[in-house]
């Protein structure tokens, strides 16, 4: 994937395994912004790697049902404090981890959330401090087509 290539040097330098599975799903979205969002999430995974663990990984996978496709990015980094989780998408919020790692601006996940909102998708995050962080981007199916069909039925377009 383009995201793995873009982050190749950082992944190698930090000895992080990058795995992609079941990611052959087709979603209708803006490819440039999608790549930007994934880069933000992967950069966070790299930045917040748990240096005490012998093996570090970032796993990207997708799952599909009738209503949506969910892209999941999972890492086994340092995790996020439960008290910080509700605010990770807030502008300029860096939380405890951001204070410990001076590279944090608090803008990455904020921008990811704003882009998801604009593109009609949803982003969510779950984490356990010291264990993992899981980011999910949900792409809803047929919203665009449903809108057009509804408009056609009412005689307007």
Specify the residue positions occupied by each region the protein language model found.
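Conserved micro-motifs of the catalytic ATP-binding
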Residues: 22, 26-29
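Glycine-rich ATP-lid/hinge loop adjacent to the conserved G-boxes
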Residues: 50-51, 93-103
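Acidic ATP/Mg2+-coordinating residue in the GHKL
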Residues: 75
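Short helix-loop "hinge" at the ATP-lid/N-box region of the Bergerat-fold HATPase_c
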Residues: 45-49
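Short conserved segment of the HATPase_c
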Residues: 80-92, 152
């Amino acid at each position: 994937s383009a995201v793995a290539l873009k982050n190749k040097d950082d992944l190698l330098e930090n000895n992080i395994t990058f795995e992609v599975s079941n990611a052959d799903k087709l979603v209708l979205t803006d490819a440039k912004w999608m790549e930007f969002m994934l880069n933000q999430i992967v950069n966070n995974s790299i930045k917040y790697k748990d240096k005490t663990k012998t093996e570090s990984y970032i796993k990207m996978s997708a799952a599909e049902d009738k209503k949506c496709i969910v892209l999941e990015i999972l890492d086994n980094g340092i995790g996020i404090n439960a008290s910080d989780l509700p605010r990770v998408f807030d502008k300029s919020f860096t939380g405890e981890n951001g204070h410990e790692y001076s590279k944090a601006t608090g803008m990455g996940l904020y921008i990811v959330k704003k882009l998801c909102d604009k593109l009609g998708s949803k982003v969510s995050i779950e984490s356990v401090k010291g264990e993992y962080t899981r980011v999910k981007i949900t792409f809803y199916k047929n919203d665009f087509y449903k809108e057009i069909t509804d408009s056609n039925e009412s005689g307007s377009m």
